[in-house]
Amino acid sequence: MWSQRKRIYSKKMKNCFKFSCSADWQLHRILSFEGGFLGAYAVASRAGIFASAQTGNLMSAMECLYKGEGEALLFRIGFAVVFSGALVLSYILKVYAGKDLKSYCMFIDAAALFIMSLLPETLNPIVAVYPLAFAASFQWGTFSGSDGYNSSTIFITNNLKQCVWGFTEYIHSGNGAAREKGVYYGITLILFLAGACLGYVSVGLAGIKGGLIGLIPLGAAGYILKR
């Protein structure tokens, strides 16, 4: 009886983690970690500016418009243009040029970290995160999920929602597919937050230069991509 239950449990767990060995999912894991690192690095090193999304930036732009802060408004608009430009570029390269963008993404992320580590602390923080805004946006256009799941690697709101929905549905109905969904998004959340933690630690230890630590997970992703 015990052996039979053990076999059933092992089979369920194997099905639950059946995506864990795919190269796409491994890359997704690493880039989720990197996405958390990039976000935290920008926040910790540049006055709390989150480079990986536009909701806060555009809301702040409306505040600048209301207050008549013209220069700050231009910086915010520039931030949005840089972010949007990376999305346009990733779309053109993917759809019209037929390029596999993964290796391009690694290079752009690495270049952004190098540039950010060289920019002076006195530079306007919004302008200073432009390189990371471009890199994060390009990463979003490149790594948008794996194994049939749509999942961002640069921010986690939708990942949190899908994780909660997946486990809620599983608890309610016992649907194995819902459990797999919850596990997938749950692991993505954990890795993103682990990367964010490393980002804060890196800045705490090395200041702006701490961003170079983010090259380590990029190297791991490059290894998986080339093997």
What feature does the model see in each segment?
Residues W2-R227:
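Alpha-helical transmembrane segments of multi-pass membrane proteins
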